[in-house]
Amino acid sequence: MYDGMGCIVTLPRKYNEYLERQGIKCRIFSPIVPLLSTHQNNRDHRKIMVIDGATAFCGGINISDEYINEKMRFGHWKDTGFMLRGEAVAGFTAMFLEMWNVNDEHIEDCGEYIQASKKYSVSTDGFVIPFGDTPLDEVYVGKRAYINNLNNASEYTYIMTPYLVIDDEMYECMKYAAQRGVDVKIIMPHIPDKKYAFYLARTYYKELLKAGIEI
């Protein structure tokens, strides 16, 4: 599954049909249509790979030559990804299936895919609860997670992001954390791939630095 807008200039038209002919099931999430609708803003920017319910990969890495530095449009490309094993993989399976089933067609017996992770249980001292924001949500789960972490941080909060677009509530949480002694650091790229987002982020720098946040 790939996003209709995110891949509009990088993939050939009807690429999904080409994949289908190769035996690969493929769907386009929220394809672009020539109609004015707020649904055109519903996009899925997540990158999820789940293998047999045992292993999940997630992060910021797209399937693109830039991410393995075969193409150097903006210098050496650095991104973050992680691998997860165990029952928590079921969370990523559920997130994928939720988007996959947005269309009329549905996978029969989705529980089969969710339950597959139970046999790969891993014994550890901690726990992992995957979560995600989707265009289907009425609650901004990701934003709430950030705010909760900032409000509960006692020593430090380090954030690395390519795009820094924050509202007043998020700014106040960052500012308050820094003012009560939490070490708040934000890492941003110096060479942007999206110039408008780069210059928008810089409009926050002065106030963030004044609050004691390092960038």
Say what each PLM segment does.
Residues 1-215:
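Charged, low-complexity intrinsically disordered terminal segments
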